[in-house]
């Protein structure tokens, strides 16, 4: 039996929270909906049903540690275990239970934060110092995520990555390849740079009813007195002065009066994760099926990564070679001749394209940036740019409106 939950972690200098939502219950609450929720239900009805979804919300602050051990216990109970089941005929059986936690960018952030929390919760005298350590670790993760070498060489991050969490992970950020949702070319080198899509962008695609961006009210005298005035660099500063510094909200201190809005924001993010599952269930089922059929871990893999893992598994089985014996083997090329990669069956009927084909067969490139090869072809009234990135038509910006008198044909 698999217990599925979605979760999200939030950290501030004085507060740490984790929100869990029961995925099965969420799906049951909206089982009658097809497509986006807003296509079927009113906002009022959506909110009503969301309020009824099973949620578990935990937070600790520098002044409130009442939920600390509850959170630790909640996480530890996710360890794989057996439960005793008795059917109507009094037959007793042992049923294996595991927890699968769904999230967004969990492999590179939330899982590490949970691991660090479980490694550290009993090492500090009070939650003030525990949260300080969690906050500093969070900043380190964010700082190093664009530097993969430093990220994987950092001792603290490595310990968290290797920590055996009590649950299995399904990272939808990876599943839907949102870590490389689009790309741009570096203007100097031509190198392809991947661009990710955040949860807020995803919520727009899902037509989610509420687009939330967490925003704290301006710093007031209470926050200055309790926190900022105790920091040497801000001692004597007014609230107005500190507000003008443009401090990020996630680097602010969450006063008790702001806890509920923060938790609502956190829960909304988790609901969006659940909605991703509801709208794309086949993608999730596919990964469970492949994992069961082939015994490879693909719950957090994009389709391209699944194909690579499958091919590696099947090739290893067919050849008897260990994956490490062939995965890194490759042919290093300093020169690429187009003649070697243009298939012989490619032929054209028009003289213009026949000449183009022959000229391209004579081309050799020594790098793959945008300046290595580029040519423009004017064919049947449309200009095309052929380069290392592919072929694209060159069109002037315009708006074309069809009617019964005109048929617009584009050869691209």
Which role does the model predict for each range below?
Residues 1-3, 80, 97-99, 405-406:
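Short coil/turn segments at beta-strand junctions that form active-site/ligand-binding loops
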Residues 10, 188-194, 204-212, 219-412:
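Conserved "right-hand" nucleotidyltransferase catalytic core of DNA-directed polymerases
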């Amino acid at each position: 039996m698999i217990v599925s939950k979605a979760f999200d972690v939030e950290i501030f200098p004085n507060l740490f929270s984790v929100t869990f939502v029961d995925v099965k219950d969420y799906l049951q609450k909206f089982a009658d909906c097809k497509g986006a929720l807003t296509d079927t239900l009113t906002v009022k009805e959506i909110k009503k049903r969301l309020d009824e979804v099973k949620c578990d919300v935990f937070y600790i602050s520098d002044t409130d540690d009442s939920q600390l051990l509850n959170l630790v216990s909640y996480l530890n109970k996710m360890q794989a275990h057996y439960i005793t089941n008795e059917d109507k005929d009094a037959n007793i059986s042992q049923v294996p239970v595991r927890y699968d936690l769904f999230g967004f960018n969990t492999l590179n952030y939330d899982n590490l934060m949970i691991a660090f929390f479980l490694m550290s919760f009993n090492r500090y005298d009070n939650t003030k110092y525990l949260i300080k350590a969690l906050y500093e670790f969070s900043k380190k993760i964010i700082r190093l995520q664009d530097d993969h070498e430093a990220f994987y060489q950092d001792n603290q991050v490595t310990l968290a990555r290797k920590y055996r969490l009590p649950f299995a992970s399904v990272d939808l950020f990876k599943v839907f390849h949102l870590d490389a949702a689009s790309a741009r070319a570096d203007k100097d080198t031509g190198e392809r740079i991947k661009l990710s899509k955040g949860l807020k962008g995803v919520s727009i695609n899902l037509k989610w009813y509420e687009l939330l961006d967490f925003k704290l009210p301006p710093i007031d005298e209470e926050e200055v007195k309790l926190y900022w005035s105790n920091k040497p660099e801000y001692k004597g500063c007014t609230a107005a002065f500190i507000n003008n510094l443009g401090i990020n909200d996630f680097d602010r201190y969450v006063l008790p009066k702001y806890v509920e809005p923060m938790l609502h924001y956190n829960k909304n993010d988790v609901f969006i994760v659940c909605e991703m599952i509801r709208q794309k269930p086949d993608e999730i089922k596919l990964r469970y099926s492949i994992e069961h059929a082939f015994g490879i871990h693909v719950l957090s893999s994009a389709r391209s990564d699944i194909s690579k893992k499958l091919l590696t598994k099947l090739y290893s089985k067919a050849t008897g070679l260990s994956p490490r014996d062939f995965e890194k083997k490759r042919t290093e090329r300093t020169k690429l001749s187009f003649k070697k990669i243009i298939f012989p069956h490619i032929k054209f009927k028009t003289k213009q394209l026949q000449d183009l084909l022959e000229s391209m067969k004579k081309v050799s490139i020594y790098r793959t940036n945008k300046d290595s090869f580029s040519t423009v072809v004017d064919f049947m009234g449309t200009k095309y740019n052929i380069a290392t990135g592919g072929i694209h038509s060159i069109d002037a910006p315009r708006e074309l409106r069809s009617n019964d008198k005109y048929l617009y044909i584009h050869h691209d």
